[in-house]
Amino acid sequence: MDYGDFVIEKEISYSINFSQDLLYKILNSYIVPNYSLAQQYFDLYDENGFRTRIPIQSACNNIISSVKKTNSKHKKFVYWPKDTNALVPLVWRESKEIKLPYKTLSHNLSKIIKVYVYQHDKIEIKFEHVYFSKSDIDLFDSTMANKISKLLTLLENGDASETLQNSQVGSDEILARIRLEYEFDDDAPDDAQLNVMCNIIADMEALTDAQNISPFVPLTTLIDKMAPRKFEREQKIVYGDDAFDNASVKKWALKLDGMRGRGLFMRNFCIIQTDDMQFYKTKMANLFALNNIVAFQCEVMDKQKIYITDLLQVFKYKYNNRTQYECGVNASYAIDPVTAIECINYMNNNVQSVTLTDTCPAIELRFQQFFDPPLQQSNYMTVSVDGYVVLDTELRYVKYKWMPTTELEYDAVNKSFNTLNGPLNGLMILTDLPELLHENIYECVITDTTINVLKHRRDRIVPN
């Protein structure tokens, strides 16, 4: 949006992160045959980060312009094109471009980039040739350079994604890049345009499937980076009371009573770690269209079935001409609850189940199903459940349970249970478990006179 002396720019962008030969394959076999070349120009960046654009074609009106770009928003999110198995990590940027007189520019350049812009509807496909890129970061090794770049981004509230990580482009090297951009003026992007953009991305990345790109990734580090969503509150279900407050319910599902776990879907591979430190891994066909890492939450039911209950994050592969392919461990894309639920329901309808053949015995993997309100109570379940999981209209998770539970630590010496505040004395202990172990955590229901022990929580170390 042009305001005269400055322009407010809103855009959704995506970078195609592949090696140079694959980028040229995408250009020659997909972009050039299917889309028209709309613009060509040079972008010159001086040592202060000011950009000067020199057009080559008349489509740009042959006006040389210089701007100072200041970022005001940089949001990573995951978009799900409806009725597909694609989770697309995108970046939403908003910036202010202030027009500059040429006298304010420096003669010392830091970047020289030639850009070819191919147009489809409102989507721009940019194929770039980086002829020159110089940065003080190039003086450091790759690890230190990445840390400095991240720190600078935090200090300036800017965007370091344009910085080539330790690229050191030489005089005989021209670095190719492909980016997709969709600019919009409204408060939010148009879903139709996002669907078009995601279809183009899927088509491009499908051309590289035969390469079977699957770099080594730090699995335990990625699992530790995952943050399951928290329940904002817990609500007791009263027996015989069918009057749920459905006005505040957006989606609901059965609360499965299993062992919680976290896992990663990768190309041809899946790994799961449960809260009691059990690992499940198997080779399997890629369930998602794009070659990224999808982090999920699950419930393991009696070591026979695993239900995917939530999709949490997407980790995207990066590429540079020094360290080649690597996973952006510290740059994940969060999946919002609504997107996760819609994708899980689609996978529930279309994937049904997958057998994890590398486990012993074989385990069936399924996607849980979420429902629209109203909540419905059922007297018969084929799996063990202990209530409902509700996503309310404010996109907060709420736990509905028939019996609110507490995690207590057993004291075998005094034959009592302890909370963080001390022992619970004078209550009768009821349990069907063969034995209660000293200083172990158990999930219990507390009444006025009894402590009913439900199950042993090997995944807990302190009472709750």
UniProtKB/Swiss-Prot annotation:
Its main location: host cell. The active site is at residue 255. GO terms for biological process: DNA-templated viral transcription; regulation of DNA-templated transcription. Keywords: GTP-binding, Host cytoplasm, Host nucleus, Hydrolase, mRNA capping, mRNA processing, Nucleotide-binding, Nucleotidyltransferase, Transferase. Residues 1-204 are annotated as: mRNA triphosphatase. Component of the viral DNA-dependent RNA polymerase that catalyzes two reactions involved in viral RNA cap formation: an RNA 5'-triphosphatase that hydrolyzes the gamma phosphate of triphosphate-terminated RNA and a guanylyltransferase that reacts with GTP to form a covalent protein-guanylate adduct. Therefore plays an essential role in late and very late gene expression. Tpase and GTAse regions, and GTase active site inferred by structural homology with vaccinia virus TPase/GTase family. Belongs to the baculoviridae LEF-4 family. This is mRNA capping enzyme LEF-4. It comes from Autographa californica nuclear polyhedrosis virus (AcMNPV). The gene is LEF-4.
